[in-house]
Amino acid sequence: MNYKNILIVLGCLLFGSCSKFLDPYPNGDRTRDDVFKYQESIQGLIGRSYDYLGSDGGAKNYNSNEMAYLECATDNAVRRSTTDAIVQFAKGELTTGNQFIVRDYWARDYNAIFLLNLFLKDNRGMKARVLIKPELNTLVVRRLQGEAFGLRAWAERDLLKKFGGKELGGARLLGFPIVTEPLNASENIDVERNTYDDCVKQIIADCDSALKYLPLAHRDYLYTSGYLSDKKDFLGSVNWNRVDGMTMYSIKAMTYLSWASKRFNPTNEVARWDSAAKYAAKVMDFKRAGSPNGDGYDPSKRVDFNDVYDKSIVWSSRLAENDITMESVFFPAAANGNNFGPYGDIGATSEFVGAFGDKNGYPISESAIYDATKPFDNRDPRFYAVINYNSRTYTPAYGTTSPIYTFETWEPDDQGLNGGKDRAGNGNNVRTNLYVKKFCYGINWKQSGFQRRPRARFNIRYAHMALAFAEAANQVVGPNGTLYGYSPKTVIGTLRAMKTYEDKTGISAADPYLASVASAGTAPFYDLIKNERRIELVFEGERFHDMSRWTNDAEFSSLYNKPVHGVKTTKNGAIYTYDLTWEVENRAYKSAYMPIPYDEILRMTKMVQNEGWNQWK
């Protein structure tokens, strides 16, 4: 681990600050030992940790779009660049000379962990004075203490999710080196990776420690009476976007879910599944109940990604006040106006399109209404809120009720002329001819002086917990059984029937296909859950980890080491012909795991590489 670099980075903090959270080193006169003499520096240890974990780990800003780019390492998406590190990873061509992607993941998490350990060391953060009034000081430092444990748990889970795997040349399942002390760069550091099981226990322990200090949620209604009711400057929604108790229960649910999965649970210990279901249900209960005013989240309603306070949110990033990052990534170059400047960087695959069934909920392979010559007709209503395709129009949610753009992806004629403006290969357009609509519902770039809206990334939302619960509970009680107040079938049925992101009606609540699969038993229903998870969480950073944890090595290679495809469109007058078997890029993963950064392997004799990365040892 490059702890010397971590301390160098701390020195760089002298020259930078964040707009909302404080900097631990606001001027060049303060040292590491001075941090606890200044209240702004003490709080800055936590604030800067949010920064690290948001670049791009989730906590900072909407425009940190790691989650979308990670999808290009899966069968769901393809990046326009053919030399990008994430593309090389998926093609089995990633070399040690292009290791920055994994090195950045590793470094940002350990940078945050260093600062958090500094805060937690000898309980110094809890002993600090950040406010004059003792009562208020206690409120703030307790919250900061909880955040320190909670953010460390988030960083640790990110490390485990990205780097947990089987050791090269052995059989052990390993995680990351557990570090709970602020290590000194002058020390001769040579640490080893802890076992996967030990890393899970560490994450759970940090969540439990955080729960001792954090409020259940940062909501004003929790402080409407009693001696804390007049402390709204320090409690409640003023701390929105910071981790809270519900965040901790969510991290526990997601950690147990991974630990229970096939790759990391070789003996299929049911208790792990049960724990994942228990904590997911706890969050679901809280979100649905809401305040005494009856304003809880209704899971039949849509998720509004334009609403930074959407009720589905468990924990979100800080706001990006004026942002069009995802629109720029997903829209074609021709969709320009008023300095919008899109560049068509990420396109969806035919494989992902195939995950959507028909409008009645049946897979297209079993559909009575699907027509392969018209592959975009009569599809699952959710499809239309996620994918833009040839001849599809775009109408922004604000400023007009009329379409302002039509996607055109057809091939040129025999003379090489008259091709669609948005087709692959024509400038800055996606390579698959399938454009992503998710997250992009608001802006009207044709409107003079168009407004970029405040945005936030939903790090954890209700659907994460609903899907975690359904997957885990299905393994414990089956599709129709009840566990912690819910059945997997009911939870999945609600997700399928909910309003789409564009507020359109979902699959009919009757859903005969869902009923038939539920009656078929646990294994078929598990396959359905996997597909629902793929659809609902696309471009939210889960797919590669899911591909890995759901399989063993042979299954992973068989299922995913194959080409991915786009759609080739031919135009004849007003008639379009679609070929969804148009090969775009081959997938040839070296491993179901990401590699440990090569720098770390060279630096430390005890550090073991992940299976499949023989050239990185």
Task: Give residue spans per PLM region.
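Bacterial Sec-dependent N-terminal signal peptides
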Residues: 1-28
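Long, intrinsically disordered, low-complexity segments
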Residues: 17-18, 84, 109-112, 187, ...
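An aromatic- and glycine-enriched ligand-binding surface/loop that stacks and positions planar moieties
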Residues: 19-88, 101, 145, 164-176, ...
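Conserved, well-structured interaction surfaces
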Residues: 43-44, 51, 82-165, 186-219, ...
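Surface-exposed intrinsically disordered loops and tails
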Residues: 217-237, 292-303, 342, 415-428, ...
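C-terminal substrate/ligand-recognition segments
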Residues: 381-498
